[in-house]
Curated annotation (Swiss-Prot):
Family statement drawn from the similarity comment of this UniProt entry: Belongs to the FGGY kinase family.
HAMAP family: Fuculokinase
Name the record gives this protein: L-fuculokinase
Keywords: ATP-binding, Carbohydrate metabolism, Fucose metabolism, Kinase, Nucleotide-binding, Transferase
Organism: Salmonella typhi
UniProt lineage: Bacteria, Pseudomonadati, Pseudomonadota, Gammaproteobacteria, Enterobacterales
Length: 472
């Protein structure tokens, strides 16, 4: 008997993947290939995406899974991507201009001068989204100022997930959580902001019908089916922006903060209310729409493991095993014997260590970095509680940084709440599959789909004794 699966097509900045997931959230088959942006012909410093190349990479992944998928029934397809990027298209869906990558510097000047149209504070109060140079708003203003005829000719703007969905189904749609990254929405109305559009001279007609996560978009058309090596007629279900599905797929409940710990740490929460007027007071803050209507995802981000990588390179070597650093830091008592580190190496003139003596070792420096980053997390969590109107009782931790058990224990001790570590790295894929199963009618809600998954967490509890390395 063939196994029913949802096929998740995940377009990341570095990899394109096709992953088949069963009803219990288990991965049945997966394939991956490298993804990369292209250099723009207009300027060698500019970056753009080739939609055709991305579709071909999906095709390569799907065809490499043909043997495994022959034993499955693909019940539905979902697409997840990074946010903000997209393109203007004509009535046939043909790109009028290449997809400007979030890595492209051309829109930085637009961000710096956006006050010509609307104050940055009002912009964030309305949209929730922080001032990041890659925001969709700045791309559209750049196109308006540099290629005005294209906006006049355009049938619509499609975010990158919707560009892919259009190639699959022929439907023109706007994925709601992608729009939530754009800085174009009135986040409280869950629709495009008349005030922002009017101020910047952008037409509402550019944005086609909004679809919620889990909603059917259409069915896989013959040409796309042939390209992917799949049967035509498979339902395509809206899944959208990767961040929101990572939160849901990690098992996060409303009011439970999630820390994605990597080179950057991104702290977000699924909140029923948010005070967006506070956001502009805090650099690095943002708020996006949750995958479920009525919820918001306020968040903050800061450089984290990037600091630790710098410390390793400075005091050890880039190849030194992390366990060597951890063992040396674990031998140092909490408080690092008075050595403290201000960890904002990007923006703070006072960044670096204080309290250094002739007895200070590199273990002190690394431990002080771990404690300094945790103090930064503590401040940001308190800020997020204020913005999102919640009180954290535990912190859910995902990402590469969660493998550092000493750091996890320091977090539990300094925050004085349990740290809950999810080892499964495929949270985005899991979340997208849950909405896919809901969208094809297998479950009555995404939550019911999520209830089928057996989550395995490791806990780090606050303690006053020397750090343990094994979670309970």
């Amino acid at each position: 008997m063939k196994q029913d699966v949802i096929l998740v097509l995940d377009c990341g900045a570095t990899n394109v993947r096709a992953i088949a997931v069963d009803r219990q959230g288990k991965i049945v088959a997966r394939a991956s290939t490298a993804n990369a942006s292209d250099i723009a012909a207009e300027n060698s410093a500019w970056h753009q995406w080739s939609l055709d190349a991305i579709l071909q990479r999906f095709a390569d992944c799907c065809r490499s899974l043909s043997s495994a998928l022959s034993e499955c029934v693909v019940r539905g397809i979902t697409v997840t991507t990074f946010g903000v990027d997209g393109a203007l298209v004509d009535a046939q869906g043909k790109l009028l201009y290449p997809v400007i990558s979030w890595k492209c510097p051309r829109t930085a000047a637009v961000m710096e001068t956006i006050e010509r149209f609307i104050s940055p504070r009002q912009l964030q109060t309305l949209s929730g989204v922080g001032a990041f140079s890659f925001n969709t708003l700045y791309k559209l203003v750049w196109l308006k100022e540099n290629h005005p005829r294209l906006l006049e000719q355009a049938h619509c703007w499609l975010f990158i997930s919707s560009l892919i969905n259009h190639r699959l189904t022929g439907e023109f749609t706007t994925d709601i959580t992608m729009a939530g990254t754009s800085q174009l929405l009135d986040i409280h109305q869950r629709d495009f902001s008349p005030e922002i559009l009017q101020a910047t001279g952008l037409a509402r007609r550019l944005f086609p019908r909004i679809v919620e996560a889990g909603a059917p978009i259409g069915t896989l058309q013959t040409d796309a089916a042939r390209l992917l090596g799949l049967p035509a007629g498979v339902p395509v279900i809206s899944a959208e922006h990767d961040t929101q599905f990572a939160l849901f797929g990690a098992g996060a409940q409303q009011g439970e903060p999630v820390l994605s710990s990597g080179t950057w740490e991104i702290l977000m929460v699924r909140s029923g209310q948010v005070d967006t007027s506070l956001l502009s007071q805090y650099p690095g803050s943002t708020c996006e729409l949750d995958s479920q209507s009525g919820l918001y995802n306020p968040g903050m981000q800061w450089l984290a493991s990037g600091v630790l990588e710098w410390v390793r390179k400075l005091l050890w070597t880039p190849e030194t095993p992390w366990q060597t650093l951890i063992d040396e830091a674990r031998a140092i008592p909490a408080g690092a014997e008075g050595v403290r580190m201000q960890c904002d190496l990007l923006a703070c003139q006072n960044a670096g260590w204080q309290g250094v003596t002739l007895n200070t070792t590199r273990g002190h420096f690394y431990r002080a970095a771990l404690e300094g980053l945790t103090a930064q997390l503590q401040r940001n969590l308190r800020t997020l509680e204020k913005i999102g109107h919640f009180n954290a009782t535990e912190l859910l931790l995902v990402g590469g940084g969660s493998r550092n058990a000493l750091w996890n224990q320091i977090k539990a001790n300094q925050l004085d709440i349990p740290i809950k570590v999810l080892d499964d790295a495929e949270t985005t894929v899991a979340g997208a599959a849950m909405f896919g199963w809901y969208g094809v009618g297998e479950f009555s809600s995404p939550e019911q789909a999520r209830a089928q998954v057996n989550y395995q967490y490791r806990y780090f509890w606050p303690q006053t004794e020397p750090e343990i390395i094994e979670g309970v």
